Amino acid sequence: MPITIAVDAMGSDKAPTPEIEGALQAIRHFDVRVILVGKQDVLREHLGAHAHPGRLPIEIVHASEVISMHDKAALAVRSKRDSSMRVGLRLVREGKADAFVTAGNTGAAMATAKMVLGALPGVDRPALAAVFPTEKRTAAILLDVGANVDCKPQNLQQFAIMGEVYFRTVFAGKSPHARSPRVGILSIGEEETKGNELTREAYKLVKTLPLNFVGNVEGRDLFNGNVDVLVCDGFVGNVALKISEGLVKTVREMLKESLQQTIARQVGFLLSRQAFVDFKKRLDYSEYGGAPLLGLKGAAFVGHGSSNANAIKNAIRVAAEYVEHRVNEAIAREIAAASEKLGNHHSSAKKEEGEEARA
């Protein structure tokens, strides 16, 4: 039976075109069913331009409101009760969809997901995990990249557990280290004593876990392929992510400018074109889809606001893989197994349950 993915069709900068085209690509390549959530008339018009909606495994669910990129997250989440984000996440909570994908306002997406779905038992704070390429042709993940600006050491310990589970399950067969992912803490030095109070205390907690913990990892080693799961607070993670995105863009432009300087270089480029195509693809964020919010009672993925159809297609793919590998069930088991060491018997997850009903 196909996995059903609810897509916020009004989320991206150029919505709904990337969402609709990405959904159409996804149903052609993967065994999935897609629910497009948004303004019904707009979606029917755009979808009808591509194919007859009734002949596709695509359903449209109406949502009268849209949370824009300029909306303040906290206010929009509370006031726009019929937003495409909120309606899509409700579909997951009600079992009508297996996962939710949005390329909309990141802050609003994270806040809405926490409110509508709630956290898994034992999870204090869900974390946003970003997948990035390494020089060894394997992927790695960084979390948190923005869901929690301020963290406690036990939060980073839980991030390590959730990130390790995600990598071990979803990257099985894709990475030589999937059976025993190497977990590290992003810090300013490799020694246990380096870093601030948060990273030093987190180090003590993470090393007590039955994980392949490699210790502290410096920022310069982010892409060298020597670590599979890198843990940090959301402030540091988001800064690292944005710097990486900016660096990739700069390198591309510098390379393009350099290759155009002489005829000899242009000829060299033509002779090596396939290598450059491969290089570009490895650095293309759209190939990695969306970032999962780990630790929720449901699967939710957040993509880049500038997502194109390929990014949406791949976000649907990774969301389906997440569901297929039962990542949430695995996270719940590992968190429960470590609960005594974590000391989180009074999880904030209980406080979040039913929060939407009170909103």
UniProtKB/Swiss-Prot annotation:
GO terms for molecular function: phosphate:acyl-[acyl carrier protein] acyltransferase activity. Its main location: cytoplasm. Transmembrane segments: none annotated. GO terms for cellular component: cytoplasm. The keyword Transcription does not apply. Keywords: Cytoplasm, Lipid biosynthesis, Lipid metabolism, Phospholipid biosynthesis, Phospholipid metabolism, Transferase. Pathway: Lipid metabolism; phospholipid metabolism. It catalyses: a fatty acyl-[ACP] + phosphate = an acyl phosphate + holo-[ACP]. It is found in: Cytoplasm. GO terms for biological process: fatty acid biosynthetic process; phospholipid biosynthetic process. Belongs to the PlsX family. Catalyzes the reversible formation of acyl-phosphate (acyl-PO(4)) from acyl-[acyl-carrier-protein] (acyl-ACP). This enzyme utilizes acyl-ACP as fatty acyl donor, but not acyl-CoA. Homodimer. Probably interacts with PlsY. This is Phosphate acyltransferase. The lineage of its organism: Bacteria, Pseudomonadati, Acidobacteriota, Terriglobia, Terriglobales.
